[in-house]
Amino acid sequence: MAQRNGMSPRPPPLGRGRGAGGPSGVGSSPPSSCVPMGATSTAGTGASAAPTATPGHGVHRVEPRGPPGAPPSSGNNSNFWHGPERLLLSQIPVERQALTELEYQAMGAVWRAAFLANSTGRAMRKWSQRDAGTLLPLGRPYGFYARVTPRSQMNGVGATDLRQLSPRDAWIVLVATVVHEVDPAADPTVGDKAGHPEGLCAQDGLYLALGAGFRVFVYDLANNTLILAARDADEWFRHGAGEVVRLYRCNRLGVGTPRATLLPQPALRQTLLRAEEATALGRELRRRWAGTTVALQTPGRRLQPMVLLGAWQELAQYEPFASAPHPASLLTAVRRHLNQRLCCGWLALGAVLPARWLGCAAGPATGTTSPPAASGTETEAAGGDAPCAMAGAVGSAVTIPPQPYGGAGGSAICVPNADAHAVVGADATAAAAAAAAAPTVMVGPTAMAGPAASGTVPRAMLVVVLDELGAVFGYCPLDGHVYPLAAELSHFLRAGVLGALALGRESAPAAEAARRLLPELDREQWERPRWDALHLHPRAALWAREPHGQWEFMFREQRGDPIHDPVAFRLSDARTLGLDLTTVMTERQSQLPEKYIGFYQIRKPPWLMEQPPPPSRQTKPDAATMPPPLSAQASVSYALRYDDESWRPLSTVDDHKAWLDLDESHWVLGDSRPDDIKQRRLLKATQRRGAEIDRPMPVVPEECYDQRFTTEGHQVIPLCASEPEDDDEDPTYDELPSRPPQKHKPPDKPPRLCKTGPGPPPLPPKQRHGSTDGKVSAPRQSEHHKRQTRPPRPPPPKFGDRTAAHLSQNMRDMYLDMCTSSGHRPRPPAPPRPKKCQTHAPHHVHH
C-alpha cells in the first residue's frame, strides 16, 4: 500500500479488521503541513521523535496487537512513546483549553479500546488486566500519562469503595496510575531514564478511575478525594485532565510539562518560594514588592495580571469595592468573613485582574501615564506570553489596546522558553517579535497608563490570600465565596487560579472538605450529563445509543472544531442526531433552580429596572443568542475564565435557610497551631450542616440595591422589607393588638362578626325549637375555629308579597347590626314568631 508524504496510510473503517483505528481520519498520521515534525522537538526524550511507518495501521507499532495504544508483545511500551500521537499532543499550548479536531482524533485513537470496553465494571477490570503496562496520554496537560495498572498492583488502595464519594455512579473501577515526566535537574536520581517510560514519576499517589458512561475520575489517595475529570468520553477527548488542579502540585515536574508563572525577578521568586512563614513573607512583600504586577499563568486561559498588595485597604481602588456605598465598611465586612472562614491569621497576596489589563497599570481611573520611575519594579520579559502581548507594556513607547479574549485557545502565539516545551505558533514573525521584546516596567496601583485604563476602574476578579497552613485561597467578589486555589505557593505558581475555574468537582469526606474549605458539590455536574452531550440525550437517534454508534458520531468526518465556532459545532451535532438545539437548551434551563431574592434585600423600583419587551416584540429564542444552561457554580467559573466583568448573580442569600456565623474572633498570624485551625473549621462545618453561608456580596443581582454595612462589618437590615418573590405567597405581618373589651349587650340575632380578641363570656345556650327538655346545647367550637370562620350570610329573600322597599329596609337593618359604632339605631320590632308545632310521638313502621 502506498504511503502519503512519508506517513502511514489511513486506517480501515470502524469495526473492520483487527485493531481498527476508528472512522476515516481517526488515528491516522497528520500530514507534514499540519504537524511540522522538524520544527518541534519533544523535551525529555533521548530517542528521535521521527516514527517509522508501519503499513496498514494509523498508529506506529512494533508487532501490532490489539487496538491502538496496546503494548507490544515484547513488553516495551514504545508504540505511543515514539508514535505521532505523542508528538502531536505535545504541541498543545498551555493557554488553550480544548483540543483541535486533529488532536481530538489522536486522543480517541489511543483511548478507543478503553471506550469500547466501558460496558460494565467487570469488563473494565478485564481490560486493565489484559492491557497492563499500556501508557495512555491525558491530553492536557502535556507530560502526564495514565499507566494501565490492575487494582491488585496499586499500593495503598486496598478495598476502597469510590462509590461512597460518588453515589450517583453504579460502578467505578480504578484502571491506571497517573505518572508524569521528571526534570533531571530537580531529581538527579533519574539519570539517563529521563527520556524513557521507566523514568516517569509515580509518587504523587494519583490514580485514574472510569465509571459508567465513560465518566473519568482522578483519585487522590493521600487526601481521599475523588475529582471528576470528565463526564463523558467526548469531554475527555476534548479537554483531557487539564482542569484537575492536583496534577500541578508535584515539585519534580519535567521541563516538558506546562510552564509555571514567570516571576519578574529571581529575587521575588526566592521571596515567595523560600518564605518559612506567612508573617515574614508579608513583611517582605510590603517592604519591597508592593504594587508589583505578576503575569499569572493559569492552564486553560490566557495570562492575567496579579497586583501584589501592600495593605488590605488598597482593594478600595478596584471594583466592585470602589463603587460600593461605603467601600471601607464593605472591606471590613469581607475581612470579617475571611476571618470566620479561614479560622486563622491570613495574608492578602494580591488582586487578580482581567487579562485586558496586562501591560497597563492597575489603579484608580486617572487616565494619566506614569513614568517608569514612579512606582513598581523593573521586570523581565516573559517568553510564551504572546497572547497578552507584553511588548507594549507600561514604560515602552508602544501602547496596547485591551484585547478581548473569546474562545479558549484562539490564535495564540507561543514561543519556546526555559520553562515550557517548544510550540510552533501561527505566526513565527510575531512570535519572534514577542520573544525579543525589551524589558518592561509594571507600574503599581498608584497611577494609570494605557488605553485600557482611560475612564474605567479595573475589576478585581479574585483576591488571593495565604493562610497560616501555607494554603492559597481566593476570595471571589462575584459571589462572595472563598475557594481553595493551591496547597502551597509553588503549587499556586503552576496552577494559577485553576481551582476557581472548575468549582464543585471535588468530592471528599466531611472532615477533609472542612479542613480544605472545599466548595459544595455541583449536583448539576455530578448527577446529570452535560447539556451539550447531545449523543446522550434521551431523544437522540437510536443508532447513537450503542458504543459503536457513539464512536462513529464523535469521530465522523467534518464534524468541526468547537474552538472557533462552538454554536455551529453544536448545531451540526443536533442535526446529525435529529434534535432541536434551542429546545434542548430551553428544557435544560427550566430544570435549573429558580432565582431567589432575600426578604431583607431591597429591590429597585420598577422604573429603574430594564423592562422586558412586550410579547408582540419578543423574538423567538435562538441557540446562538441564548445563554448556556449552567448551574450557579459553573456560571461563576465561566465568568472567571472569560473575564465577564458584567456578570451578576441571579440569587441572593436565603435569609431563612442561610447559616449566620457569629464568631467575632480576630486571629493574628503565627498564634494558631495547625491542629487548632483544623478543629475550628471542622466545628463550624458541623454546625452549618451543609447550609448556605450568610456572607457579604459585593456584587448583587441586577434588580437589587447594594448591601450596606456598619463600620464593624455587620450588615444593615432595612426597615422596609421587599415584597415576596411569588405573588401567590402569603406575606407575613406582625399580629395587631386586640381591642379592649366593651360592655356586652345581648343581641336578639346571632353575631355577624368574628371576635379576634378576648371578649365577654359566652352566652348560655338557647333552647332549640322543637326540643322537649330545653337542655340541648349548641356544638362547641375551638377558639382557632372561631377566628377562621366567616360571618354567616343573610338568608335568601322570599319573593312573595314583599316589595323592593321591604328588601331594602331589611338590608339596611342588617348593615346596622354589623356596625361596631357605639351609637346604634333603634331596631324595628321583631316580626311575630310562628306558632310552635305540637310534638308527636315517633311512628313505628313495621315491615
Swiss-Prot record:
Positions with biased composition (Acidic residues): 723-733
Biased composition annotated in UniProt, kind: Gly residues: 16-25
Keyword tags: Host cytoplasm, Host nucleus, Host-virus interaction, Inhibition of host innate immune response by virus, Inhibition of host interferon signaling pathway by virus, Inhibition of host PKR by virus, Interferon antiviral system evasion, Transcription, Viral immunoevasion, Virion
GO annotations of cellular component type: host cell cytoplasm; host cell nucleus; viral tegument
A Pfam family the protein falls into: US22
Region (Disordered): 1-82, 607-627, 715-847
GO terms under biological process: symbiont-mediated suppression of host innate immune response; symbiont-mediated suppression of host PKR/eIFalpha signaling; symbiont-mediated suppression of host type I interferon-mediated signaling pathway
Subcellular location: Virion; Host cytoplasm; Host nucleus
Entries under InterPro entries matching the protein: US22-like (IPR003360)
Compositionally biased region (Low complexity): 26-56
GO MF terms held by the record: protein serine/threonine kinase inhibitor activity
Subunit annotation: Interacts (via N-terminus) with the viral DNA polymerase accessory subunit UL44. Interacts (via C-terminus) with host EIF2AK2.
Family of the protein in this entry: Belongs to the herpesviridae US22 family.
Task performed by this protein: Acts as a transactivator along with IE2, and is required for oriLyt-dependent DNA replication in the transient transfection replication assay using native promoters.
Name under which the protein is recorded: Protein IRS1
Source organism (scientific name): Human cytomegalovirus (strain Merlin)
Organismal lineage: Viruses, Duplodnaviria, Heunggongvirae, Peploviricota, Herviviricetes
The encoding gene: IRS1
